[in-house]
Amino acid sequence: MIKRQKLKYKWMLITTLITFTTILLFCLIIIFFLKDTLRSSEIDEAERSSNDIANLFHSKSLSDISALDLNASLENFQEILIYDDKGRKLIQTSNDNTLAYDNKIDFKHPERIHIHRSHGINYLVITEPIRSKEFSGYSVLVHSLQNYDNLVKSLYIVALAFGLIATIITAGVSYIFSSQITKPIVTMSNKMNQIRRDGFQNKLELTTNYEETDNLIDTFNEMMYQIEESFNQQRQFVEDASHELRTPLQIIQGHLNLIQRWGKKDPAVLEESLNISIEEVNRITKLVEELLLLTKDRVNHNVLECENVDINSEIQSRVKSLQHLHPDYTFETHLATKPIQLKINRHQFEQLLLIFIDNAMKYDTEHKHIKIVTQLKNKMIMIDITDHGMGIPKADLEFIFDRFYRVDKSRARSQGGNGLGLSIAEKIVQLNGGMIQVESELQNYTTFKISFPVLN
């Protein structure tokens, strides 16, 4: 199993290796070119001395040339050896007594320039033939490369030291920098562990002055807010659903106990208890169906068969049916003169109409006047449903589409609602690309404005 590394150590290791490698390569390249330049300079210096010696033999005879004359043509750390044609050494002189070159020269196959190592020191050796009127032989110039080699070694040591110092500095800076970068990540990790232990607390308060990590913190805070909100909604949903199911179950249980005690002998009690129990079972069934509908997602919606629905005809059909059931209500319709086609599942649209009209009727028990308007405006299909009932307080407007939320909680059960209708309606509208707006004034009116885009 591969051992996991901390991000800051991994970051520090990578940046340090990259920096060290870069500096090392850079120094090696510089040393390579500098070494080549210095070597050329050493060769040029030896060439000049060798040429001066050759010119000296062309201007003077061998007997007139002294050791001082030869030394005057030499630079520091150089030695000159003069041989005749037979390879006999005639003169050997140097301006540096520390030179210890003792290699024999092969005059049959002489190399003009070569490097020879003697006693641990490299020497540049230049062999030149001398042909003058009075002398014929060879000059051998020995140029010590000890200073050159020492300088190159020093350059390597300096480069290595510089690389190590730069590496240490880079490692320190990388550690500090990576610690600053990973600090919000570590803090968020600790925060998540705290949330796991203690539940949701305050948001993460941290500023790093780095755009990426600050965005990460903002995203984390937003995500935690959404998770907390979702968690609270889920908890509230479970509590509300439990409450909604508990009430009819308690009623059913009470009437079953009543039947067990007296209903066996009293047909009236039996009939009443059975009717109430059936009504509560129907209420539970409807509640479960609506809860299942709310859990359906867009994938399930895509499976539904959609068709072009004439919304004016559907509204007229629903209003006609409701008028027969509720003759005491007035349904005022102002429908668009031209047919309006909406691509939607017909059952969903019928359910949508019934939810809004039923909701309007529940909260308009005094005037009993429901107004429905349709129009086509700015490539949008508009449906307005207005009641003249109790209205909705402004503080409640943002919550009316929440599950189990009721404006008038004291009257909700007597009106037969369970607080899921508007949540279902909102989901149907959203799944079909529409939107809902609400306008309301207390003790005056409430208008639900439903709009759908016109699709070609």
UniProtKB/Swiss-Prot annotation:
Instruction: List, alphabetically, the SUPFAM superfamilies matched.
Output: ATPase domain of HSP90 chaperone/DNA topoisomerase II/histidine kinase, HAMP domain-like, Homodimeric domain of signal transducing histidine kinase
One Gene Ontology molecular-function label:
ATP binding
Q: What keywords were assigned to this record?
A: ATP-binding, Cell membrane, Kinase, Membrane, Nucleotide-binding, Phosphoprotein, Transferase, Transmembrane, Transmembrane helix, Two-component regulatory system
Keyword Protein biosynthesis attributed: no
Q: How is it modified after translation?
A: Autophosphorylated.
**Species in which this protein is naturally found:** Staphylococcus epidermidis (strain ATCC 35984 / DSM 28319 / BCRC 17069 / CCUG 31568 / BM 3577 / RP62A)
Function in brief:
Member of the two-component regulatory system ArlS/ArlR. ArlS probably functions as a sensor protein kinase which is autophosphorylated at a histidine residue and transfers its phosphate group to ArlR.
Name used for this protein in its record:
Signal transduction histidine-protein kinase ArlS
Every copy of the Histidine kinase domain together lies at 240-456
This protein's GO cellular component annotations are: plasma membrane
Span of domain HAMP: 179-232
Write down the SMART domains for this protein, in alphabetical order: HATPase_c, HisKA
The topology of this chain with respect to the membrane is: Multi-pass membrane protein
Task: Give yes or no: UniProt keyword Phosphoprotein.
Answer: yes
Q: Which EC numbers characterise this protein's activity in its record?
A: 2.7.13.3
PANTHER family, per this entry?
A: SENSOR HISTIDINE KINASE CPXA
Reaction(s) catalysed by this chain, per the record, are: ATP + protein L-histidine = ADP + protein N-phospho-L-histidine
Q: Where are the transmembrane segments?
A: 13-33, 157-177
Question: InterPro entries, from UniProt?
Answer: ArlS_N, Bact_Sensor_His_Kinase, HAMP_dom, HATPase_C_sf, His_kinase_dom, HisK_dim/P_dom, HisK_dim/P_sf, Sig_transdc_His_kin-like_C
The cellular location(s) given in this protein's UniProt record come to: Cell membrane
